[in-house]
Amino acid sequence: MDSTDNSQSVGDVQFAPLARTIIKITGSDRAAFLHNFSTNDIVKMQPGDRCEAFITSVQGKTLGHVVVYCVEEALVLVTADGQQETLINHLDRYIIMEDVELENCSGIASTWLLFGEGIPSVASELNGVEFMSPYGYCGETCQLLLGDASTAESLEQLQVREASSDQIETLRLEAGFVEFGVDVTEANLPQEVARDAIAISFTKGCYLGQETVARIDALGHVNWLMRTMTGIGLASLNAGDEIAGDDGKKIARLTSCSNASDPNQKIALGYVHNDFAESGTTIADGIQVA
C-alpha cells in the first residue's frame, strides 16, 4: 500500500465499524426460493444488482428488513446485527427439495461503513476487502466493507477519518434508513415502514405473507407510516416517546432520535398517524414531518 499523503484524494471520506448480520444463499434455486419469502422481485436480479426487501411471516408481518446483493453464484442478505438466527431458522424450515443452502457469514468478516465523495480513491488503495455497494445506511455514497481486523488500520493510513457513532446515527436518520429491531419489529406491516417503492413489488405474484400486503394495497393505506421528523421540539423527547394531538390522542411514536447536522435542529424517525403523515405537517410545537 502506498503510504504517501492521500489527504487530497480521500476528500471527505469517513469510516465507522458497523456490526451486521450477513447471510449468504447459494444453490441453483436460490433466487426462486428467496423470491417466495420476500416482498421484492428477486428473480429479476442479475449479478451486480441490489435491492431492499422485507422477509415476511405467513401473517404478512415483517420478520426482517434486508438489503439483497446479487453476486456470482450467490445472494447476500445484509441486515441489522443479531438477526441471523431468526432469519435462517425461518427460511430453513421451508427448504424441502430445493437446491438452496443458507450460510451465516456474520462475524466471519469485520464490517465497516465507508462514505463520502472520494471513495474510488480509497478503494483503489485497499487490499483484501469486499465492497457491498451501495448500502444506503448513511446516505447515497455509503458502502459496506467486508474486511478484517487490519481494515481500520489500513483506512487510517490512508488518512480516512473515523466517524463517531453519534455522527453515524445522525446520518442514518437523515438518510431515512430504518434499522430492524429499532425502527421496525415483527409487529409491523411492510407498508407501515413506508419503503414501498424500493422494497415491495406489487406485481411479482405470490409469496409468503403476500395476501396481507396485497389486501392493504387494495384498501389504500395503513393507519401508521414511518416518517422522518425534524425540529427543536424534539430536544426533550427520546426514542419510545409518544406525541399526542390537541385531543389527547396519540399521533406519533418515536423510534430513533438524534442531533441533526444542523446544530439548531433535532431529527427523529417514527410512526406518524396517516392523518398527519404528509410532508410539512406540524404535529407538535417545533416538530414537523420532513
Predicted regions and their residues:
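Short, surface-exposed ligand-recognition loops at beta-strand->loop->(often short) alpha-helix junctions
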Residues: 24-33, 114-119, 230-238
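Glycine-rich, small/acidic residue-mixed loop/short-helix segments
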Residues: 188, 194-200, 207-210, 214-290
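Short amphipathic alpha-helix segments
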Residues: 54, 116-127, 236-249
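Anionic-ligand-binding alpha/beta catalytic cores of soluble enzymes and soluble regulatory domains
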Residues: 146-227
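Acidic, low-complexity central loop/insert segments
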Residues: 12-15, 21-22, 67-178
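Short amphipathic beta-strand starts and helix->beta connectors
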Residues: 2-10, 54-65, 95-98, 123-132, ...
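Acidic, proline/glycine-enriched N-terminal capping motif
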Residues: 1-63, 69
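Short, intrinsically disordered, mixed-charge
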Residues: 35, 39-43, 89-97, 218, ...
